[in-house]
Amino acid sequence: MARKPDPGRRIVADNRKARFNYEITDTVEAGIALTGTEVKSLRGGKATIGEAYAGPSGDEFFLFNAYIPEYLEANRFNHETKRPRRLLLHRRQINKFLGATQREGYTVIPLKIYFNERGRAKVELGLGRGKKLHDKRETAKERDWQRDRARLLRDKG
């Protein structure tokens, strides 16, 4: 049975492939610095983070390659669709991500963009390591087995 959505948390974009392609070890909620037209476009439910990643630029973290389309009702002061967007993180979180990406071969992947209870845009970041092909096959096999098992139990009972 599907989970009921959290009443205060409206998900705008979900990176479902990230959990398949990466082994996520830790997740962190981060704020994101947006312009007005980006917020309006997000409120319309339009964003793509399938190819996005987070990385350092100087001593800050940015969200790269996230696509937020232009707001159609805006005038000439619209935003760039794939510009780097600053992530609002605490210093210790930035240092943790920097250490993991530089020393241990991890990647920082955006998992979701959503609006919290107060109406602020947030990004759920995951610290993950890329899966090998045999790990992906194992995940697919496990998922198929769970589906078959549920079907068998449902049909028997």
Swiss-Prot record:
<dbReference type="GO" id="GO:0005829">
    <property type="term" value="C:cytosol"/>
</dbReference>
<dbReference type="InterPro" id="IPR000037">
    <property type="entry name" value="SsrA-bd_prot"/>
</dbReference>
<protein>
    <recommendedName>
        <fullName>SsrA-binding protein</fullName>
    </recommendedName>
</protein>
<dbReference type="GO" id="GO:0003723">
    <property type="term" value="F:RNA binding"/>
</dbReference>
<dbReference type="Pfam" id="PF01668">
    <property type="entry name" value="SmpB"/>
</dbReference>
<comment type="similarity">
    <text>Belongs to the SmpB family.</text>
</comment>
<dbReference type="GO" id="GO:0070929">
    <property type="term" value="P:trans-translation"/>
</dbReference>
<dbReference type="InterPro" id="IPR023620">
    <property type="entry name" value="SmpB"/>
</dbReference>
<keyword id="KW-0963">Cytoplasm</keyword>
<dbReference type="InterPro" id="IPR020081">
    <property type="entry name" value="SsrA-bd_prot_CS"/>
</dbReference>
<comment type="function">
    <text>Required for rescue of stalled ribosomes mediated by trans-translation. Binds to transfer-messenger RNA (tmRNA), required for stable association of tmRNA with ribosomes. tmRNA and SmpB together mimic tRNA shape, replacing the anticodon stem-loop with SmpB. tmRNA is encoded by the ssrA gene; the 2 termini fold to resemble tRNA(Ala) and it encodes a 'tag peptide', a short internal open reading frame. During trans-translation Ala-aminoacylated tmRNA acts like a tRNA, entering the A-site of stalled ribosomes, displacing the stalled mRNA.</text>
</comment>
<keyword id="KW-0694">RNA-binding</keyword>
